[in-house]
């Protein structure tokens, strides 16, 4: 299938298609209080804390493979605005080696991404303006896997979780998408350069071997808070909606199949209906559960 784990890394295509981001950006207000921060491990993030007389809930947002913190079509930027309108803060980060964060892409691993997420979590927990007892976490595709692993390793940290376009076994899906040939090349040479069609990426063997560092079937049940999973009907991640909903341990659980949507909710088309529906449903979910 097309448009899976790395498809929403088409931010460059989005910029070209929309001539300076007119479609995505014109619909999204620039929120006061949004600042770019650098965490202790060199991870860069964008913090959005709406004005409030009391500490606000907040959502940690984790991007997918070969993407960055604003996500394709600025979906995370737009979601941050929607959350702020509901009185919810957010922190979206670039994983080490991606976006503006420090580090070498070729040294990127699943374990490293989880570590980055944990540093971001600790930062949110330390903020006076954020209610550390009302934190949520969201992941998009590979970021969804990192979300599952982060929450599984920190089961008491998050009150609510949402997944976008998230699969199950990471090794299986990456073999299908990146091919066994690239797995073998990385094992033989230490790194492999892959042309994704819109950008080049250089991955180290540690990325491929690290896909088995965590088991989603083991980690996911550790999380016991509220849970929502979202997928487009035209994407393979829809096959996992039932599994995630049925294995969620919290009292409040939901799945949302977006009819006609692909892996990135058709955000690179002129019609933003499905992308906006996904953003609204997610913002409403966190407003209800945080």
Where are these regions (language model features)?
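N-terminal cap/lid segment of alpha/beta-hydrolase-fold proteins
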Residues: 25-54, 275
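The alpha/beta-hydrolase serine catalytic core
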Residues: 43, 145, 152, 157-288
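Short beta-strand element of the alpha/beta-hydrolase
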Residues: 55-64
